[in-house]
């Protein structure tokens, strides 16, 4: 589509809104301009959603517990409030981990204070204290506790910090209070920030004076990889094959001990910039640890990132980097040769969180799939700054897109594939459009590194599945047949 066509499409879709809402939403929709250095000149982001519009965003609690803290496997994360929030954020993303669930790993379990009406009236501090005591008795191998506040906790003013300090001293364990009530901020993005700040204040400096850990010149951490489908494991294999030592993964398959040791590494490798840039910036300022954003989606971007990482180290690492790329090159070239012919020329629209709308573009390009629209649910303008240059001219950009807008854009652009979240999945599948869930890889994966065969296979089996040709209702077929008979008469 040309720039004029995209601008016309945006105006058509916005016509149904009242004038005030139409003017506000127009700021969040734009054709892409790769020449721009600052995205704020074309699109507005990280603003409060308009009341009455069906936003697809999540809340601060989801950003903290569901994204940052939840995958830390050897801690118990208490969802402090009514039971529903904890249950809805439990085991939904496929954060893989090594350990025995319920013994020394707790990622897929739901620990809740199960707030009731009486707790709202009388407060929940005593209940929280009792819950921590029970955890100490029942789960002796856990290494720490986090308290993830839900909305009622902030509304009634419970002092979870005081409870955390008291119980941490009493049980000689780490107890981290996280003020991530869902009403805070405009999206789950503030939950990421709050979670990062809680790690900074309650965890990160615990081993600053500990000299027992032997460091090497090749120590790195993987930050912002949540090990969905085993992503962090695939990334770790490549980094270790090129001679680096991965000290910590944040937070997929991660531990509290790894987090405490991270200030001792030489380089922080940041995959999901949006959710983990805050703690990475803090470590850069306090400990002098440089951070580097990298992209392990698709073989082209993976090879580029490996070479960029190697530039931070000596010639031995650079040489091993080239050996690693050469080792896997024939494999990924064979995969692309197999799948690209059936995917070439297909078009995809994306709407995800704060990373994937730009990071997966290269993976689709490797397979010959064209991006025709993308947007962030909780991205900031620095995310869009990085996105503009990855996309073609006049590609449709949409920020905090509403359910109505997304459906209308899809109807008019008619993409071959949509990549978004679980809330959108069934709407578009019922419209007969192939869909991939890009928050959990539809419980597949890994997608990171040179495991390109899994990504390619999933796109191929979705796009070229014969079921899409069988979705026409019988009465619609009858109408078509009648029209053909009438036309031939």
UniProtKB/Swiss-Prot annotation:
A Pfam family this chain is assigned to: Oxidored_nitro
Record's keyword terms, sorted: ATP-binding, Iron, Iron-sulfur, Metal-binding, Molybdenum, Nitrogen fixation, Nucleotide-binding, Oxidoreductase
Any one GO MF annotation of this record: iron-sulfur cluster binding
GO cellular component, one term: molybdenum-iron nitrogenase complex
Keyword Iron: yes
GO biological process: nitrogen fixation
Binding site for [8Fe-7S] cluster: 59, 85, 151
Cofactor note: Binds 1 [8Fe-7S] cluster per heterodimer.
SUPFAM superfamilies: Helical backbone' metal receptor
Binding positions ([7Fe-Mo-9S-C-homocitryl] cluster): 272, 439
Subunit and partners: Tetramer of two alpha and two beta chains. Forms complex with the iron protein (nitrogenase component 2).
Function summary: This molybdenum-iron protein is part of the nitrogenase complex that catalyzes the key enzymatic reactions in nitrogen fixation.
PANTHER family linked: NITROGENASE MOLYBDENUM-IRON PROTEIN ALPHA CHAIN (PTHR43457:SF1)
Family indicated by similarity: Belongs to the NifD/NifK/NifE/NifN family.
Protein name stated in the entry: Nitrogenase molybdenum-iron protein alpha chain
């Amino acid at each position: 589509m040309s720039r004029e066509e995209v601008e016309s499409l945006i105006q058509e879709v916005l016509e149904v809104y009242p004038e005030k809402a139409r003017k506000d939403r127009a700021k969040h929709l734009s054709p892409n301009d790769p020449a721009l250095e600052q995205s704020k000149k074309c699109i507005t982001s990280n603003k409060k959603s308009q009341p009455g519009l069906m936003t697809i965003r999540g809340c601060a609690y989801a950003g903290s517990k569901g994204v940052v803290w939840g995958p830390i496997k050897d801690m118990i994360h208490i969802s402090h409030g009514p039971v529903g929030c904890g249950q809805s954020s439990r085991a939904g993303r496929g954060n893989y981990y090594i350990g025995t669930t319920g013994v020394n790993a707790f990622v897929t379990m739901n620990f809740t204070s199960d707030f009731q009406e009486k707790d709202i009236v009388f407060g929940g501090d005593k209940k929280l204290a009792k819950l921590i005591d029970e955890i100490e008795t029942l789960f002796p191998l856990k290494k720490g506790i986090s308290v993830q506040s839900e909305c009622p906790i902030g509304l009634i003013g419970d002092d979870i910090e005081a409870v955390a300090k008291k119980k941490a001293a009493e049980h000689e364990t780490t107890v981290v209070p996280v003020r991530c009530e869902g009403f805070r901020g405009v999206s789950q993005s503030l939950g990421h920030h709050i979670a990062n700040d809680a790690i900074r204040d309650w965890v990160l400096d615990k081993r600053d004076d500990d000299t027992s850990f032997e460091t090497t010149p090749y120590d790195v951490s993987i930050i912002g990889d949540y090990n969905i489908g085993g992503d962090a494991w695939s990334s770790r294999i490549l980094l270790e094959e090129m001679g680096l030592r991965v000290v910590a993964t944040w937070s997929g398959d991660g531990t509290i001990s790894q987090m405490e040791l991270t200030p001792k590494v030489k380089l922080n490798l940041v995959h999901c910039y949006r959710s983990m840039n805050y703690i990475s910036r803090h470590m850069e300022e306090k400990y002098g640890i440089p951070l580097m954003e990298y992209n392990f989606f698709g073989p082209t971007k993976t090879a580029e990132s490996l070479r960029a990482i190697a530039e931070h180290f000596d010639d031995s690492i650079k040489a091993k980097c080239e050996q690693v790329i050469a080792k896997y090159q024939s494999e990924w070239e064979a995969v692309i040769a197999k799948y690209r012919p059936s995917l070439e020329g297909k078009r995809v629209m994306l709407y995800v969180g704060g990373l994937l709308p730009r990071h997966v573009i290269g993976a689709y390009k490797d397979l010959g799939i064209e991006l025709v629209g993308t947007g962030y649910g909780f991205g900031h303008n620095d995310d869009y700054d990085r996105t503009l240059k990855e996309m073609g001219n006049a590609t449709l950009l949409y920020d905090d897109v509403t359910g109505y807008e997304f459906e209308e854009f899809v109807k008019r652009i008619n993409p071959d594939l949509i990549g978004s979240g679980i809330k959108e999945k069934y709407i578009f599948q019922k419209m007969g459009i192939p869909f991939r869930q890009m928050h959990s890889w539809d419980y597949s994966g890994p997608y990171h590194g040179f495991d390109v065969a899994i990504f390619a296979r999933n796109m191929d089996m979705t796009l070229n599945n014969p079921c899409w040709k069988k979705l026409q209702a019988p009465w619609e077929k009858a109408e078509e047949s009648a029209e053909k008979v009438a036309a031939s008469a």
